[in-house]
């Protein structure tokens, strides 16, 4: 009765895939998740595209993680950092133990924020 399915936008077992090549962005994922959070309540079952069932707080934590990573990336991007610099800056270190390898997330987020194509 009180459930929402977020598909691949919410990955509860790793970092999300940002389809930056087709217009996806870290900002779009954050905005969609925030919009969903505003429409659910603490009793809502949140069904991610990958990983175990979650809830309101789990989705709120996911949004906070993405906003933190985005914020740290923008500081580096605004300072002229390359993707390689961002990959080596350790900005996801607090989350990597649970989320896994951040390489693809950082690559796609970098592209979505700068529109620079970088092979990696």
Regions flagged by a language model, labelled:
Residues 1-68:
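Metallo-beta-lactamase
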Residues 38-43, 52-120:
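Accessory terminal helices/loops
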């Amino acid at each position: 009765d009180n459930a929402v399915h977020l598909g691949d936008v919410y990955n509860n077992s790793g970092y999300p895939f940002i389809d930056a090549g087709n217009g996806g962005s870290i900002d779009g994922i954050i905005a969609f998740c925030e919009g969903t959070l505003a429409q659910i309540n603490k009793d809502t079952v949140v069904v991610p595209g990958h990983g175990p069932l979650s809830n309101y707080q789990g989705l709120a934590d996911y949004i906070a993680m993405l906003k933190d990573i985005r914020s740290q990336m923008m500081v580096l991007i605004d300072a002229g950092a390359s993707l390689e610099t961002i990959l080596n800056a350790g900005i996801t270190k607090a989350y990597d133990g649970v989320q896994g390898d951040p390489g693809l997330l950082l690559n796609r987020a970098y592209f979505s924020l700068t529109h620079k194509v970088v092979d990696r």
